[in-house]
Amino acid sequence: MPLPTRKIGQSLVSEIGFGSMGIARLGPSGFYGVVESDDERFKVLDAAHAAGCTFWDSAHLYGDSEELIGKWLKRTGKRNDIFLATKFGITPQGVRGDPDFVKEQCATSLERLGVDCIDLFYQHRVDPKTPIEITVGAMAELVKEGKVKYLGLSECSAKALRRAHAVHPIAALQIEYSPFVLDIEDPKIALLETARELGVTIVAYSPLGRGLLTGQYKSPDDFEPNDFRRTIPKFSADNFPKILDVVAQLKKIGEKHNATPGQVTLAWILAQGPEFIVIPGTKKIKYLEENVGAASIKLTEEEVAAVRKLAEESEIPGDRNARMGAMLIDSPELPQ
């Protein structure tokens, strides 16, 4: 059954996509602890496809995510059903956006995914050494060569987005956005304002607060030992009472809709405007189905306002990522 769609460039994609970071294997486990076998992970991808959740997000950095999706595409022959996004540029030594590396990472992603064209190719983080005009110029060459359809940026500054867009249209901005994280709305950051002005779609990653807005976690002790959420300052034990209070209030709003706190959260983000798309990830089919079910939840204006008030007043301290230094940064100026 198809989900409602929204635009990226001139393409229509499911308004609720699938983020594949959580399902990826990285070494012996994954970003969020234990990872299932390929067969079990294929079942999750099968369920996403069957539910009409056909905008899939991956990254060069996400362990075996690209390979897993590539195997699924080969196994099913359903390449034409999936709008495929991936990201490049993060290395163990830092971020790279030099032209040779852009081309190298695209070639690797095409091979891993087993496709001849990537629908949406993002720079994962801004390279603090390479002017963004040079990076996007190299990305634009990939469009000319037919290897990429649309270009995107992730966690850039408003100025970097504007400079990039002047070189080649930027179709999407991937950014963390949820009731916990409203950074892009800050007038000093001006990222939402700039994206709207330029017609850039907002793809919200971690829309469920990395799972904490679902109510599934009652304390950091609920995270598996190797779960990277243990490193996030915002999710400290001291903050959990505030986090759980937000969840309780979302649950109360959801009762009128027979909806979970997570569904209310996704519905609220989608209610921010037609330029918003969400890409929650999960390792389990039951949570995938819950996420997709948010498409049928229509909050009233009063409920949208109530969630906003909750988000603005919750004031949960701490960085949203242990590596905040790489977030929302600008790019060096192009030499004259």
Swiss-Prot record:
Gene3D superfamilies: NADP-dependent oxidoreductase domain. SUPFAM superfamilies: NAD(P)-linked oxidoreductase. Substrate binds at H124. Its EC number is 1.1.1.-. Induction: Induced in strobilurin-producing conditions (on CGC medium after 6 days of growth). Keywords: NADP, Oxidoreductase. The structure of strobilurin A was used for the development of the major class of beta-methoxyacrylate agricultural fungicides since its beta-methoxyacrylate toxophore targets the Qo site of complex III of the mitochondrial electron transport chain and prevents adenosine triphosphate synthesis. Compounds such as azoxystrobin (Syngenta) and Kresoxim methyl (BASF) are among the most widely used fungicides worldwide. This class of antifungals are used as effective treatments against a broad range of destructive fungal plant pathogens and make significant contributions to food security. InterPro entries: AKR (IPR020471), Aldo-Keto_reductase (IPR050791), NADP_OxRdtase_dom (IPR023210), NADP_OxRdtase_dom_sf (IPR036812). GO terms for cellular component: cytoplasm. The active site is at Y62 (proton donor). Pathway: Mycotoxin biosynthesis. NADP(+) binds at residues 57, 154-155, 174, 206-220, 283-291. It is an enzyme of class 1 (oxidoreductase). One of its GO terms (molecular function) is aldo-keto reductase (NADPH) activity. Belongs to the aldo/keto reductase family. Aldo/keto reductase 2 subfamily. Aldo-keto reductase; part of the gene cluster that mediates the biosynthesis of strobilurin A, an antifungal polyketide that contains a key beta-methoxyacrylate toxophore that targets the complex III of the mitochondrial electron transport chain. Strobilurin biosynthesis begins with construction of benzoyl CoA by step-wise elimination of ammonia from phenylalanine by the phenylalanine ammonia-lyase str11, oxygenation by str8 and retro-Claisen reaction to form benzoic acid, which is activated to its CoA thiolester benzoyl CoA by the dedicated CoA ligase str10. PANTHER family: AFLATOXIN B1 ALDEHYDE REDUCTASE, ALDO-KETO REDUCTASE YAKC [NADP(+)]. This is Aldo-keto reductase str7.
